[in-house]
């Protein structure tokens, strides 16, 4: 079943539609990984979205058991930029985010949220990563123009009800993505990549699919993978010492070489169309014991009262000493 899901996801990413925004699907990680955070600490979205871009997060410094609070994830990028879609056309970027909470924390229900929190999350559909990991939250894809910031409503656990939870400082891991990735779920390259020369040599010809695969000579058509059988796909032929080498370039990336140009193996033959990327941040979150807060307030009040009494006592002594001097 997992293989079928991955195949369907790859198909959706590659085919796309003409004017729809480029997709950012954190759900691909959900289908391929039991846990989206690797042992190294890296969130797996970075495995497909290779470009690094900033992510911002606002997390409360401390919360108490049962408190409903919000985590705000900022996904900044230049709204004037567009990137290539799967069919080679240009479109806006979608965004997505992953929040890895400490175990015991979970997504707040609508009934648990305040009216303000309901309004902040009204246009977002947030889901737990899985039944086994309700502390990991996913959202996306969402239109990036309207969702530069995403709000996650969260409920803090109560150690009295869950013995596995303790009053202590925890770590929250947050990943934010914008735009399509460079690696498809099946491991193949998307068209949101730089394509490079397969060998050292000279570019001798460029064959282009104008409408369908029949536009190419049979020997070149056989080289085109199914996901690249689209108008605008090009097959570049290079004359090398080892014979003729070919490179299939899907629609989207723009060629930066011309027929007759000499290239070295690994030289870029297209521009880099990617304008998106993934960012990850970490924040501390303290689960505070309200009893400790009460005792702290009582201690501070006692200190303040003691200081006040000392000041009054000092004034009293000064007055007595002044009276004795006058007497």
From Swiss-Prot:
Keywords: Electron transport, Heme, Iron, Membrane, Metal-binding, Photosynthesis, Signal, Thylakoid, Transmembrane, Transmembrane helix, Transport. GO terms for biological process: photosynthesis. The chain crosses the membrane at residues 293-313. This is Cytochrome f. Coiled coil: none annotated. HAMAP family: Cytb6_f_cytF (MF_00610). The keyword Heme applies. Heme binds at residues 25, 45, 48-49. Its cofactor is heme. SUPFAM superfamilies: Cytochrome f subunit of the cytochrome b6f complex, transmembrane anchor, Cytochrome f, large domain, Rudiment single hybrid motif. Binds 1 heme group covalently. It comes from Synechococcus sp. (strain JA-3-3Ab) (Cyanobacteria bacterium Yellowstone A-Prime). PANTHER family: CYTOCHROME F, PTHR33288. Belongs to the cytochrome f family. It is found in: Cellular thylakoid membrane. One of its GO terms (molecular function) is heme binding.
């Amino acid at each position: 079943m997992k293989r079928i899901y991955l195949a369907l996801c790859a198909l959706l990413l590659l085919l796309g539609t003409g004017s729809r925004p480029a997709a950012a699907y954190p759900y691909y990680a959900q289908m391929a990984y039991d846990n989206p955070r690797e042992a190294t600490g890296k969130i797996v979205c970075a495995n497909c979205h290779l470009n690094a871009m900033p992510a911002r997060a606002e997390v409360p410094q401390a919360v108490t058991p049962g408190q409903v609070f919000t985590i705000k994830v900022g996904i900044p990028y230049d709204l004037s930029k567009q990137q290539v879609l799967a069919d080679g056309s240009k479109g806006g970027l979608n965004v997505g985010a992953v929040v890895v909470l400490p175990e015991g924390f979970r997504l707040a229900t609508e009934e648990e949220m305040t009216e303000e929190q309901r309004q902040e999350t009204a246009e977002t559909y947030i889901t737990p990563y899985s039944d086994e990991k309700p502390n990991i939250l996913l959202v996306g894809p969402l239109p990036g123009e309207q969702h530069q910031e995403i709000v996650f409503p969260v409920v803090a656990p109560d150690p009295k009800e869950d013995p596995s939870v303790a009053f202590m400082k925890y770590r929250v891991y947050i990943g934010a993505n914008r735009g399509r990735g460079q690696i498809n779920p099946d491991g193949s390259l998307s068209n949101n990549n730089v394509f490079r020369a397969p060998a050292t040599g000279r570019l001798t010809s460029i064959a282009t699919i104008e409408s369908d695969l029949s536009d190419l000579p049979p020997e070149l058509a056989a080289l085109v993978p199914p996901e690249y059988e689209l108008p605008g796909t090009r097959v570049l032929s290079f004359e090398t010492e080892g014979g003729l080498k070919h490179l299939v370039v899907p629609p989207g990336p723009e060629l930066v070489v011309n027929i007759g140009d000499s290239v070295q193996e690994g030289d870029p033959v297209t521009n880099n169309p990617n304008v998106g990327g993934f960012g990850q941040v970490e924040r501390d979150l303290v689960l505070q014991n309200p009893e400790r807060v009460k005792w702290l307030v009582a201690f501070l009040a006692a200190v303040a009262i003691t200081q006040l009494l000392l000041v009054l006592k000092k004034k009293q002594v000064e007055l007595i000493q002044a009276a004795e001097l006058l007497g």
